[in-house]
Amino acid sequence: MDTNRPGAFVLSSAPLAALHNMAEMKTSLFPYALQGPAGFKAPALGGLGAQLPLGTPHGISDILGRPVGAAGGGLLGGLPRLNGLASSAGVYFGPAAAVARGYPKPLAELPGRPPIFWPGVVQGAPWRDPRLAGPAPAGGVLDKDGKKKHSRPTFSGQQIFALEKTFEQTKYLAGPERARLAYSLGMTESQVKVWFQNRRTKWRKRHAVEMASAKKKQDSDAEKLKVGGSDAEDDDEYNRPLDPNSDDEKITRLLKKHKPSNLALVSPCGGGAGDAL
């Protein structure tokens, strides 16, 4: 080893010598990478084309000289085509291959549920966006059971006021009256008819409750009058002079109805308070 060369002591070890050889090899392989931007000179296109052999189909001049269809076919020639992929998939996943390999029947041929198709494949991505939902069905709004859901109409305060005033005058409307009222209120005849039917049902229930309450009150008043009349008759008998020898039953009945404090003052024999004491 020449020890007079500068840096010879650095290359005395085997690993450092290997690194030095790799650096020299890199310099010889990539001369343009080590030069500055000013010293870099791009090789001419004709020179590169001349260096490549004439039979090579991947040269720059050959690629640029091809038509568009031929270039695309040459570039994509190595990629597998869809038809080939489908045919190969049919070989592995077809019904004949399944039977030959001993697998059971495909899902489409099995009895029971129909094959499942994912919405993302059949309908595409827009089905996920609720803003792109389709219009409502023409038959009206459907509930969760699939039946048609009837929406209840709402009336304004002016319409309800006019209907109530008309109902106070008459509980039933004839055909011309109903048509005239519906036209004046901006409603349909069926709406007016249904409103009067519901209003009559409500009125009958309220009227029945009021009649039952009035009858109950009347019966209570009659019972009070009856009880008050019997008390008045007893008071009249109590104020009358009684014969102690013949009116013992009346005296006993009157004593039972009055307060027990009067028992000490009146005796059945007609004696006074002094006799009782």
From Swiss-Prot:
- The superkingdom of the source organism is Eukaryota
Q: Which UniProt keywords apply?
A: Developmental protein, Disease variant, DNA-binding, Homeobox, Leukodystrophy, Neurodegeneration, Nucleus, Repressor
Which SUPFAM superfamilies does this UniProt record tie to the protein? Homeodomain-like
Q: Enumerate the residue ranges of region (Disordered).
A: 132-155, 210-250
Cell compartments where the protein resides: Nucleus
Q: Outline the segment boundaries, as ranges, of region: Repressor domain.
A: 89-142
Q: Where is the composition biased (Basic and acidic residues)?
A: 216-226
| Keyword Nucleotide-binding attributed | no
UniProt xrefs under InterPro entries = HD (IPR001356), HD_metazoa (IPR020479), Homeobox_CS (IPR017970), Homeobox_NK-like (IPR050394), Homeodomain-like_sf (IPR009057), HTH_motif (IPR000047)
What tissue expression does the UniProt record report for this protein? Highest expression in brain.
Functional summary from the UniProt entry: Transcription factor with repressor activity involved in the regulation of axon-glial interactions at myelin paranodes in oligodendrocytes. Binds to the consensus DNA sequence 5'-(A/T)TTAATGA-3'. In oligodendrocytes, binds to MBP and PLP1 promoter regions.
Q: Which disease is it linked to?
A: Spastic ataxia 8, autosomal recessive, with hypomyelinating leukodystrophy: An autosomal recessive neurodegenerative disorder characterized by early-onset hypotonia which progresses to a pyramidal syndrome with ataxia, spasticity, hyperreflexia, weakness and loss of ambulation. Brain imaging shows cerebellar atrophy and hypomyelinating leukodystrophy.
Q: What is this protein called?
A: Homeobox protein Nkx-6.2
Which organism was this protein described from?
Answer: Homo sapiens
